[in-house]
């Protein structure tokens, strides 16, 4: 009888703790690393939301500790750390890893996707299931979810960019191999550079321009060291929410289900925030003294023509590249 009473009291206390958001010690503590600063709102806020959902829905059995702002690893180091098991989870950029897995360059194909939602539709339809997910799992990384991260624009310091010829001879920072090739075709001199190094490089004149999404310019305060942006929506980046495969396999099925469901919700949450962000970004840049130009159809046509050979270049890197391109076009 005493044992029954104690059990009932324990259950009541546990129910009270859970309802108030207080949990017992976690059975599984996972380390999540991202280089994103907290100023990268539409990217990092859904990650915090994901971690919170997992904790609540698992009744505290899983706790994900998020280390942001490159506290553990930089953007180009995250995937390797995930493979090795130095961290349990991350949301690396595909663009940063296209040199290792060229198929990731599909998001960087110029003017392939007309909008973030079109890109997300292709991702949700299974774009990465054509081989990318399988290749990563073979290296010990399980992809849980892939989310559209936003289109790349052209930033200039001391000069405007209205046509490809405006980039001729300019030193431009890029983040991926396909974007690098596109800038070469436009006549620029590309150099690979992480977003955290852009401010100082622009300030010192090490680079003259960069191809980056809008969130980089605002999140890194690049408006303080450059004065022109041309909106071209040339290509995209994505973030893939992933977990070390050994970590994943140690989790029981019920907790895997909790984590997967929360991960699936992340992409739609990020998409909504991204679309709102793009509406507001132009005004914020202009308030900070940046000339913000939206490329006209004629101007876009010139850029499209200049960088079109990127497709053939990429096909040379990826034997079944047409499979990815055709799928992307049909599933927007």
Where are these regions (language model features)?
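Bacterial N-terminal signal peptides
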Residues: 8-20
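N-terminal secretory/targeting leader peptides
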Residues: 10, 25-119, 127, 134-332
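Positively charged n-region of N-terminal signal peptides that target proteins for export
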Residues: 1-7
């Amino acid at each position: 009888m005493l044992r029954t009473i104690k059990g009932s009291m324990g259950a009541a206390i546990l129910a009270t703790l859970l309802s108030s958001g207080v949990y017992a010690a976690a059975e599984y503590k996972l380390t999540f690393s991202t280089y994103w600063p907290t100023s990268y709102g539409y990217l990092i806020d859904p990650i915090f939301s994901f971690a919170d959902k997992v904790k609540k829905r698992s009744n505290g059995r899983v706790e994900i500790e998020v280390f942001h702002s490159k506290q553990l690893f930089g953007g180009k180091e995250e995937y390797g750390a995930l493979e090795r098991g130095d961290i349990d989870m991350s949301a690396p950029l595909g663009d940063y890893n296209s040199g290792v897995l060229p198929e990731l360059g599909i998001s960087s194909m110029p003017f392939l996707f007309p909008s973030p939602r079109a890109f997300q539709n292709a991702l949700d339809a299974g774009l990465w299931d054509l081989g990318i997910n399988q290749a990563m799992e073979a290296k010990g990384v399980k992809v849980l979810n892939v989310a559209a991260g936003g289109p790349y624009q052209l930033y200039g310091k001391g000069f405007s960019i209205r046509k490809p010829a405006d980039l001729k001879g300019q030193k431009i920072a890029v983040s991926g191999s396909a974007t690098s090739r596109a800038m070469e075709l436009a006549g620029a001199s590309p150099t690979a550079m992480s977003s955290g190094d852009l401010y100082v490089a622009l300030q010192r004149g090490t680079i003259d321009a960069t191809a980056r999404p809008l969130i980089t310019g605002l999140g890194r305060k690049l408006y303080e060291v450059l004065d022109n942006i041309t909106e071209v929506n040339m290509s995209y980046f994505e973030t893939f929410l992933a977990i070390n495969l050994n970590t994943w396999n140690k989790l029981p099925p019920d907790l895997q289900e909790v984590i997967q469901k929360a991960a699936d919700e992340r992409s739609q949450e990020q998409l909504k925030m991204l679309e709102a962000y793009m509406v507001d970004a132009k005004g914020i840049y202009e308030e900070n003294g940046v000339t913000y130009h939206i490329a006209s159809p004629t101007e876009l046509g010139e850029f499209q023509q200049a960088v079109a050979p990127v497709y053939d270049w990429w096909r040379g890197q990826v034997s079944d590249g047409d499979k990815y391109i055709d799928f992307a076009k049909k599933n927007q």
